[in-house]
Design a protein with these regions (language model features):
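C-terminal soluble interaction/assembly domains
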Residues: 254-258, 263-277, 284, 291, ...
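N-terminal secretory targeting modules
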Residues: 1-175, 185-188, 203-206, 377-378
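Structural recognition of the beta-strand scaffold that forms the well-ordered cores
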Residues: 171-176, 180, 209-215, 245-250, ...
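Catalytic His-Asp segment of secreted/periplasmic serine-dependent ester chemistry enzymes
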Residues: 231, 257-259, 296-378
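Oxyanion-hole/transition-state-stabilizing segment in secreted/luminal serine hydrolases
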Residues: 185, 216-271
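Catalytic nucleophile-elbow at a beta strand-turn-alpha helix junction centered on a G-D-S/GDSL motif
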Residues: 169-195, 217-220
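Short, solvent-exposed loop/turn and secondary-structure capping segments
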Residues: 119-124, 183-190, 222-226, 259-262, ...
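Short amphipathic alpha-helices and their capping/turn segments at secondary-structure boundaries
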Residues: 159-168, 189-203, 226-243, 278-282
């Protein structure tokens, strides 16, 4: 059967503000969604202001702690070379790597970045909601047990892992903000709603889909913050993902909250509707089935005190009603309906609330993954 590349794991490239590095090996532990016998690694210098040199990259199956299983360790090359130079704003894709991996397996990707990288360079990263590791200066990419000088909560430079899959295997991209990224969920518990979606697809069996989490904390539809806005990054983070057949967009709450606090960045419901409609049309034009996720309630949130108001909530309600009725998306996933308090729809039901009244907790994130109708992907 013919095969093609499908994304099995992603991390949205964004600026890791204030991060400086001193010739470390970075060991990170992504959990993939689908398996395969051949993979490739994607590294990004999206936030960099100059060339980024990666001196060595290894991939293996995870061992204990910061370790790897040495029998699975593979050297990753780029056009036959163990090192690669990535221009500012660019990314690179590795040569194919022969390693058989199972769905939902934990991998270890180790990269060595030589020399001093000051904070002014612009390190590319994203919050991980799990423990990854930095070494003292030196190349420890091939070591089974890497001495860690620092525990980090980031993905540095690693932006994707693809597997070679049968032609009938599809890809689902989750485009969102911190609620998609699983902010404030338990570390190393894999409680993000895309994690739960991936588990359900694997458990169901049958037709398989890679699940690519392109959540980015603080992200908005209309304005940049901590990286590109939803409409700006849509081509890179959705349309260009290997094997993508379906996408779910869950954005808008940070626009309504005015996460930046700038008066000139206040938005109307129509602004958000226009942005969402653009994404839906662009996906359809590429043959991708696009699903809209309604905006969840956030009355009296404490993450950014004063961000909620009745007037802002009215915008949220208006956008959600448009999503449900306009037919712009192939289907709507009504996260608002499933998470809100039926007795008080402007707020999240306490069992799903992590306590800041904006982000779900582990139970809420798993609920989001559970309410997605898997028949949407048939």
């Amino acid at each position: 059967m013919a095969s093609h590349w499908v994304g099995t794991w992603t991390a949205t490239p964004a600026p890791a503000d204030g991060v400086a590095l001193s010739s470390p090996t970075i060991r990170m532990f992504p959990r993939i969604s689908i398996g395969g016998d051949t993979m490739r690694i994607r590294l990004s210098n999206a936030a960099g202001t100059g060339d980024l040199v990666i001196a060595a990259t290894h991939v293996a199956k995870r061992g204990a702690g910061a370790g790897v299983r040495p029998d699975t360790d593979r050297v990753v090359t780029f056009n036959g070379s163990g090192s690669v130079k990535i221009p500012a704003g660019a990314f690179v894709v590795s040569d194919p790597v022969s390693l058989t991996v199972r769905p939902l397996e934990d991998l270890a990707v180790s990269i060595h970045v030589p020399g001093e990288i000051p904070a002014s360079f612009g390190v590319t990263g994203r919050y991980a909601r799990q423990f990854n590791y930095l070494s003292p200066p030196g190349d420890f990419t091939g070591m089974e047990i890497m001495h860690a000088s620092r525990v980090i909560d980031d993905w540095f430079f690693l932006s994707g892992i693809d597997v070679l899959a049968a032609r009938d295997v599809g890809g689902i991209v989750a485009l969102g903000d911190s609620i998609t990224d699983g902010n404030i969920s338990t570390h190393d518990a894999f409680c993000r709603w895309p994690d739960q979606l991936a588990r359900r697809i694997v458990t169901r069996g049958g037709k398989m889909f890679g699940v690519m989490n392109q959540g980015l904390g603080g992200n908005r539809i209309c304005h940049d913050i901590r990286g590109d806005s939803g409409v700006r990054r849509f081509d890179r983070d959705v349309l260009s993902q290997p094997g993508v057949t379906h996408a779910i967009v869950v954005l808008g709450v940070n626009d309504i909250r005015n996460r930046s606090g700038r008066k000139e960045e206040e938005v109307t419901a129509d602004d958000l509707i226009n942005g969402l409609n653009q994404m839906a049309m662009r996906a359809r034009a590429r043959g991708i089935k696009m699903f809209g996720g309604t905006i969840t309630p956030f009355e009296n949130e404490t993450f950014m005190v004063g961000a909620w108001s009745p007037e802002r909530d009215a915008r949220r309600v208006a956008v959600n009603e448009w999503m449900r009725s306009a037919g712009a998306f192939h289907a709507v996933i009504d996260f608002d309906k499933f998470l809100r308090d039926p007795e008080h729809p402007a707020r999240m039901l306490p069992i799903y609330d992590n306590g800041d009244h904006l982000h779900p907790g582990d139970v809420g994130y798993n609920r989001m993954g559970d309410v997605i109708d898997l028949s949407l992907f048939d």
